[in-house]
């Protein structure tokens, strides 16, 4: 078992792809909230939360998970990534609102409209990996 968990909610598959890519690069465990919602966080020092956005809001499964685990998350290093279609200020506002609602200060967005890496994901994912890599 690793000391990093990536917990995500994905609708069309982009958040899942990003989660799996990050996990492969840093050696993290992944949990898809469509399949598993009861996750023992006590094994992990770092939690990376991932979600897509619909109508400006994060996917409900992740919101429910954060609400249910708010106390356990306080003792962890928590990061949030949001997969979205926007760039620039609109994306910054969107991720800022989501992070604020969750009480998370370490948050980034990955735009589907940004430059891609070799895995056809936003190059910003690689920058994020360097930031969270143990």
Language-model features and meaning:
Residues 2-5, 16-17, 21-31, 43, ...:
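FMN-binding flavodoxin-like domain, especially the glycine-rich phosphate-binding loop
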Residues 10-16:
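Glycine-rich NAD(P) Rossmann-fold beta1-alpha1 loop
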Residues 33-36:
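Conserved SAM/SAH-binding loop
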């Amino acid at each position: 078992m690793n000391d990093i968990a990536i917990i995500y909610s994905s609708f069309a598959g982009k958040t899942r792809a990003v989660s799996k890519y990050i996990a492969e690069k840093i050696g993290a465990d992944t949990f898809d909230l469509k399949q598993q919602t009861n996750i023992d966080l006590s094994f992990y020092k770092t939690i990376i939360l991932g979600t897509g956005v619909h109508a400006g809001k994060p996917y409900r499964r992740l919101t429910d998970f954060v609400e249910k685990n708010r106390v356990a998350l306080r003792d962890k290093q928590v990061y949030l990534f949001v997969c979205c279609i926007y760039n620039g200020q609109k994306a910054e506002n969107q991720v800022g609102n989501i992070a604020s609602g969750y009480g998370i200060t370490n948050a980034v967005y990955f735009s589907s409209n940004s430059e891609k890496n070799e895995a056809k994901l936003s190059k910003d994912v690689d920058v994020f990996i360097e930031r969270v890599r143990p």
